[in-house]
A protein has these predicted regions:
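Conserved acidic, metal-coordinating active-site core of Asp-based
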Residues: 123-218, 226-232
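Active-site phosphate-binding/coordination module
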Residues: 27-139
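A short, Lys/Arg-enriched amphipathic alpha-helix followed by its capping loop at the start of a domain
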Residues: 2-9, 28-41, 219, 233
Length: 235
C-alpha cells in the first residue's frame, strides 16, 4: 500500500535503476540513494549481476555519493548487494563499497551447478547450440560457476520451450533439484538462467541481513512475469 511505511529498500539494478537500453545508473537514482542513506534507511541491491557488474555500478555511484551528495563512510555501510540473484553477499566495512564478500549458498548447490554444466557440455546438443549461446557468471577469485545462462537468439515460444525442456530434463535426470531456473535479460537478449538461488530466496536473506521483515521492505524490480527473475521484487 502507498500509505505503508517501509524500513528498508531492495532494488533490482538492470532495467530498474539504469538508463533506457543502458547499463549506466540514472543520475536521479544516485540522489535518491543518497537521500535514503541520509535517512538511515538500509539499501540492498538484489541483482543477477556478478562482481564485474557490481564494479560497473560502483563506477557510476560511488564518487558522486561521496563527493556530490556528501555521504559519509558510516552511511555507506548501509549499502549491501546480493549478487548472482543472492548467491553472494557484498558488504562494506571501510570507505570502499562492497570490499567484503561471502557466499550465502552451500557447497552442495555449487557442486550441482558444476555437474549441470559438465552434463550439458557432454551432450553437445546441436538443436540447443543452433538457437542459443551459453554464457557464464563465475567467481573471479576461484573460478566457481555461479550462473549458467542460455542466451536465446530470438523470443520465439517454440525455441523458449525447447531450451526450457532441455534444462528441466537435465535437472531431473541427474537429481539436481537444488538449482533454480529464471528468465530475464542479459546484454539486451532474452535469457534462461540456471543458478543456485533466486530473488525470492535472496529477499529472505536480506530480511535476516538488515533485521527488517520482508513486508516492511520496499522491493522494486522491473518484471511482472511470474517466471521472470524479478517477480519476487514486486511488493
Amino acid at each position: 500500500s502507498l500509505e505503508q511505511k517501509y524500513n528498508a529498500v531492495c532494488f533490482d539494478i538492470d532495467g530498474t535503476l539504469t538508463k533506457k537500453n543502458s547499463k549506466e545508473i540514472d543520475e536521479r537514482v544516485i540522489k535518491m540513494i543518497a537521500d535514503l542513506l541520509k535517512q538511515k534507511i538500509p539499501i540492498v541491491f538484489i541483482t543477477g549481476r556478478g562482481s564485474t557488474g557490481l564494479n560497473h555500478l560502483l563506477n557510476d555511484i560511488q564518487f558522486k555519493l561521496l563527493n556530490l551528495y556528501n555521504v559519509n563512510n558510516n552511511e555507506l555501510k548501509r549499502i549491501y548487494a546480493l549478487a548472482n540473484d543472492g548467491a553472494r553477499l557484498f558488504y562494506t566495512s571501510n570507505d570502499k563499497i562492497f570490499n567484503e564478500c561471502i557466499y550465502t549458498i552451500t557447497d552442495d548447490k555449487l557442486y550441482e551447478l558444476k555437474k549441470f554444466d559438465e552434463e550439458i557440455i557432454k551432450m553437445k546438443n546441436k538443436k540447443i547450440d543452433d538457437i542459443c549461446k551459453i554464457a557464464y557468471s563465475k567467481d573471479a577469485v576461484n573460478n566457481k560457476i555461479l550462473n549458467v545462462r542460455f542466451v536465446l537468439q530470438d523470443d520465439k515460444d517454440d525455441n523458449v520451450k525447447i531450451v526450457m525442456d532441455f534444462i528441466k530434463n537435465v535437472i531431473n535426470d541427474y537429481n539436481l533439484n537444488g538449482l533454480s531456473i529464471t528468465r530475464g535479460k542479459y546484454k539486451e537478449s532474452s535469457v534462461i538462467q540456471v543458478g543456485t538461488t533466486s530473488k525470492d530466496i535472496a529477499i529472505e536473506t536480506a530480511e535476516r541481513l538488515v533485521g527488517v521483515p520482508k513486508n516492511s521492505m520496499m522491493r522494486i524490480g522491473d518484471c511482472g512475469d511470474k517466471i521472470g527473475n524479478d517477480y519476487a521484487m514486486l511488493n
